[in-house]
Amino acid sequence: MQIPKLFVQTSRAKPQQYIVDMIQTKIPEWKYLHYNDAEIIQFFKENPILELPNMAEKFYSFNYGEHRADLFRYYFLYIHGGVYMDTDAMLLVNIDTIVKDYTFFSVNSSHFVGTIFQGFIGCTPRNPIIQKALINMYNTPNEVVIKSFHLFCKNLFIFYEQDNDEDNVNTNKMLLQELNENNPVYAPVMDTNNNVEVLRHYYADKIIPRDLP
């Protein structure tokens, strides 16, 4: 099974059109999707998971928008598969050169060692790594994650590593590498196998420049 050609983002407001246009030049033949909070709740209603009821209530139980976005990306990717990218990140290469035939990929964080940068994740539907992350998040109270903001990033890294130790090994997976260069504007993300910068995360002011390569 291959990663479906679905490219999804979420934020309260729709991204500016120039940003969507930039993305679409890198995702030809892919379907671009964006969800705001109301659309996320509708998605939960239209795509229920019987074992995980009352997902809208769980969504609103988190104080931070970042954690609500985490829950949605896990849920969407578990249901449909595809690629999720944060709205403060931008592709520099054609998405197909990253996805290839992987069943799961994301980014190894250099800023928070032992965690995954969840701003860029791709996987097949019902992927076991994402399934574990979704169930773990569903069962984690808001009070716990308030005290450990990057808990889900850490747990996703653990689930990725655990996958190597289980009988049903998801061998066709990959982590890109975020570089820690003390850049005050963005963090570059590299495909270290090919020594190519594939994505930039504009973590500082969260503004995507118009003049990217």
Please identify what each model-predicted range represents.
Residues M1-A69, M85-P213:
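Glycosyltransferase-associated regions of secretory-pathway enzymes
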Residues D70-G82:
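Small-residue hinge/turn detector
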